[in-house]
């Protein structure tokens, strides 16, 4: 089940609120300019499925999102616990970073924890299959796929080169719960 935990930066061990109803999650994130939506992930794909196979399986949704948002590139993160580079890939997302463009993730299998650092709050969004999250350019965030990843997410960007992050240098991400905590 998707959830949203909202923390003040001064209390990373105790959320101010925890939401589990889709409408409440979407409304709370919308107040911060974050789109959270449900899109049916009707084709079953397993973590480890190739990028080409995932995009082909979801071509209609990809085309719709690319047109709707004016996105220039699409890729897929598809990992299971047996992936040989899982620790390296996980580490690349765990530090707080920003993008100069919007980032959209459509979860078609598994789950991941998307943390958004906005002003004095951290919005920890547990995303699962059927969840779509759109993070505006410049929003500080980090992502945790867990020690034993199990996820397939389609990612879209305005930048034709795809995922390009700028680290903030803030160690805040290390203070907050991880996916497996």
From Swiss-Prot:
| E.C. number | 1.13.11.54, 1.13.11.53
Annotated keywords: Amino-acid biosynthesis, Dioxygenase, Iron, Metal-binding, Methionine biosynthesis, Nickel, Oxidoreductase
Residues the UniProt record annotates as site (Important to generate the dianion)? 105
Any GO molecular function? nickel cation binding
Keyword Metal-binding assigned = yes
For the keyword Nucleotide-binding, the answer is: no
Question: Which residues take part in binding Fe(2+)?
Answer: 97, 99, 103, 141
User: Could you describe the subunit structure of this protein?
Assistant: Monomer.
- Purpose of the protein: Catalyzes 2 different reactions between oxygen and the acireductone 1,2-dihydroxy-3-keto-5-methylthiopentene (DHK-MTPene) depending upon the metal bound in the active site. Fe-containing acireductone dioxygenase (Fe-ARD) produces formate and 2-keto-4-methylthiobutyrate (KMTB), the alpha-ketoacid precursor of methionine in the methionine recycle pathway. Ni-containing acireductone dioxygenase (Ni-ARD) produces methylthiopropionate, carbon monoxide and formate, and does not lie on the methionine recycle pathway.
Write down what this protein is called.
Answer: Acireductone dioxygenase
Originating species:
Pseudomonas fluorescens (strain ATCC BAA-477 / NRRL B-23932 / Pf-5)
Q: Which gene encodes it?
A: mtnD
